[in-house]
Amino acid sequence: MYGIIYPKTTNLEITDNMDTIILDHQLQETLVFPDPSFPIQYYVDDLHQWAGRQVPLHWHFGYEFFSAVSQDIEVQVGNEQLMLLKGESILITGGQLHSYRLTSPQEPCLCPNIVFSDNVLAPLTSTVFQKYLRHILNDSALPCTIISGQEDWQREISECLFRIYGIFTAEGNLCDTAPDHAPVKSMHSDCPEIDVHLNLFEIFKILYCHRSELHHIKISRPDQKTQIRLQKMLHYIQTRYPEKLTLE
């Protein structure tokens, strides 16, 4: 899923074995789901396949669950610098700038994740979305939520999430990753779409019931625009001035 391709005018070179993602001039990734009627996709990202062993800042309108199964992962969401410990997962809501960086170059770093739109849960105008889901997915003070497993309800969420990963693994819906590299045990389902839907709903039911325990922060739009400009400036410097810069 990941890697980075800037517009053709940037002169960025990409090796054949690098994972790629198409971003526009605002660092937005345009999501295209294989099945628009069931808009959810499963990926396993190997952060070793990235330049600098990191997924650069980008954003998209879909929601994302990302899990650290092999090692701790440095995560940036907006201005927040977070450490996702091995065994933890993070939910990042739509429209948030985010990036990932591995911490142990010598260790494997396969990270299962899912990206999905609100339509896979419920229509935006439905009672279910307006009464329950929007409090988690559309709260500007809740750009991300770490699922640490320290509490029983967090462990329940992790179990639901990894059941979803397992169902997709069993179905062979593993984007850009060889089956023998799958970091999650496959889980057969006679009704995979229904089971994925049920587990997603259970996750958000739990989050809603424990919403008062979630860590709320504020990420403003001006901050996001500033980060986009800074990221583009750094990319310009890195590609046009490969020599070490000094103040002399």
Give each language-model segment a name.
Residues 78-79, 102-104, 191:
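Short, solvent-exposed loop/turn segments at secondary-structure boundaries
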Residues 118, 161, 200:
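Short amphipathic alpha-helical/adjacent loop interface patches that line ligand
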Residues 1-91, 95-96, 130-131, 141, ...:
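Generic protein-terminus/edge-of-domain signal
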Residues 143-155, 165-248:
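Short, Lys/Arg-enriched, Trp-marked, Pro/Gly-tolerant hinge/linker segments that flank
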Residues 118-142:
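Double-stranded beta-helix
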Residues 95-119, 127-128:
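Ligand-binding loop in jelly-roll beta-barrel domains
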Residues 57, 82, 105-106, 224:
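A short beta-turn/loop motif at secondary-structure boundaries
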